[in-house]
């Protein structure tokens, strides 16, 4: 979901954040468990105290800003865009071999991954083989970064 999702595709991308949040809060109140909700930058305005994570913080070829909401404190990453250089995009329904690819409005978001293998490399994913899966994925470095924080919180609480 994103608040900037075009109106004609909103049926395919409903805002499930409030529903999921309520279910997770109920579960956490019963169990004492911790949770994280992930979404794209356009959803940050409907998330509660979201933190931003950027691929440049992990030396990845993607920036892939994602926002995370949790029922515990999470530390965000810094962005290191200058050190990273031109990011590689992994999005859409196919890789893009055309170096001069531009969006319909004429702007560029950077260079798009040229192949599935290229997408896997810049995302830090070595097991996925389908472009759609890679384009939808959260880089494993993000999961490790946030998962380590959750484990630390659980160990502290024990």
Feature-to-residue mapping (PLM):
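Conserved active-site and SAM-binding loop architecture
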Residues: 1-158
């Amino acid at each position: 979901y994103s608040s900037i999702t075009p109106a004609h595709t909103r049926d395919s991308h409903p805002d499930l954040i409030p529903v999921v949040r309520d279910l997770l809060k109920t579960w956490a109140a019963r169990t004492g468990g911790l949770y994280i909700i992930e979404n794209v930058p356009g959803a940050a305005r409907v998330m509660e105290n979201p933190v931003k994570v950027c691929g440049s913080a992990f030396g990845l070829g993607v920036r892939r800003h994602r926002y995370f909401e949790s029922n515990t404190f999470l530390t965000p990453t810094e962005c290191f865009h200058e050190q990273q250089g031109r990011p590689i995009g992994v999005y859409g329904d196919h890789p893009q071999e055309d170096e001069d690819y531009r969006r319909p409005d004429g702007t560029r978001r950077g260079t798009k991954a040229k192949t599935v293998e290229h997408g896997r490399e810049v995302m830090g994913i070595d097991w996925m083989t389908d472009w759609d899966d890679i384009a939808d994925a959260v880089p494993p470095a993000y999961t490790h970064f946030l998962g380590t924080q959750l484990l630390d919180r659980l160990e502290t609480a024990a």
